[in-house]
Amino acid sequence: MNSILKTIFVASTFFLFAFSCSETSADSDTNNDNGQNEEPAPNGEKEWQLVWADEFETEELDADKWSYQFGTGRDEGLTGWGNNELQYYSDREENIFIEDDMLHIVAREENFEGMNYTSARIRSIDKGDWLYGRFEIRAKMPEGQGIWPAIWMMPTESVYGGWAASGEIDIMEYLGHEPDKVHGTLHYGGSWPDNVDSGDDYQLDDGKFSDDFHVFTLEWEYGEIRWYVNGEHYQTQNSWYTDGHGFPAPFNQKFHMILNVAVGGNWPGNPDDTTEFPQKLIVDYVRVYQFK
């Protein structure tokens, strides 16, 4: 980690942090109002506290926490969602539902609105937006060539410019033809095509991510982002940039969460004769913690 806090300031920083916390209401707010350049107290003086969660215990998707995205991305100026994806996103029960206190996002092969595949994509924008935190998701993956589920984050307001100048945080991406591996990635730099990315992957010693549930965790602090699978830390990022702005931009603004299953696209490739449908991403819970 870059040395953001010098040793000589540790004691005074903690005193100010503790004093400010004593003046703050104990009630948790969905949105964190920390300043973009606020430096946290030392790790040893903080404690993660739950500030937002969805345990999927309702009969339908909680509209106070999530919004749907629809279609092919054409309405957003991103036909194929910018990746030449093949699915149409809907809010139909065929594509998204809650059962046994778990969220199911289902990719299907079917003709719908001019596309050959359907799926679902939801996001927490303006309902769950956070600057820094611990993000924990327990989920079971689908599998198959061309199947591309993701748990990721985008800036709520693109204050530094278009993608990826304002950043993207991929908590977990998974390619269905590599069922024992997941990826964690940051996107930043300039606006496309001057964007860059950095990341790593985690591979199971045995079995597949589609065999059972696994816990995917991301810890995001000032100047450092860490990834975990089932509590095992597998990468840390603490060096990035965005054009025209100093570190730690762009990862010093509020981001929201996105859950989706894409079909096809530039990275996974398209489904083939080996791909079986339907395919499900099943999410047990989403939990967000922040230091208080």
PLM features per residue range, with description:
Residues 18-20:
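C-terminal motif of bacterial Sec signal peptides marking the signal peptidase cleavage site
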Residues 23:
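Short, conserved catalytic or interaction motifs in soluble domains
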Residues 26-292:
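GH16 jelly-roll
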